[in-house]
Amino acid sequence: MLRLYQPCLPTRALKAPTGANWIHEIKHDGFRIIARRINGRVRLQTKQGYDYAERYPEIVEAISRLKVSSIVLDGEAMCFTGPAHDFDKLWNRTHDHEAKLCAFDLLELDGEDYRPKPLAERKKKLFKLLRRVWRGIEYVEHLEGDGAVIFEHACKLGLEGIVCTRFTLPSRPVEDLDQSQKPSAPCHAARQRSV
């Protein structure tokens, strides 16, 4: 039976969380994608439920090459032009700039639902799957430490923001928000994501 997956969406907070149980990731400004490969078919589902597989063939190819029987990833489709990414090129998608999936969570692997597992376990497994350099897909690194300091640095660098998540939580739908945080820079208010 095909499981349904909804992304754990971030919510705004006024400041970054602190404490040992939090991890912090760069907030990317791309298309949120639930990427799945089931029975050999790859789908790239947007938040609105559209399949963008035809729009991003390089992401489809990368997911097809993974040495797994089935997989579901949560991430952002990005279009990089040099060291930064370009949302307009991603949206207009003329295929003259390569897109990639920046994967930050593993939701299912080889038929096993990973959502009940703690984020620490999911990210560790995801890192092992994606530690090779893959064209079209990459693992989103995280930082541990003082969220306020990381958020301040993100603002200074002009980044879109940071996402802060409790390392011990399972992945949960957006209705369950209460224990996770996502600070968003260019000095926007902080945001939180339930995971």
Give the location of each predicted region:
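Catalytic cores of nucleic-acid ligases and guanylyltransferases
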Residues: 1-195
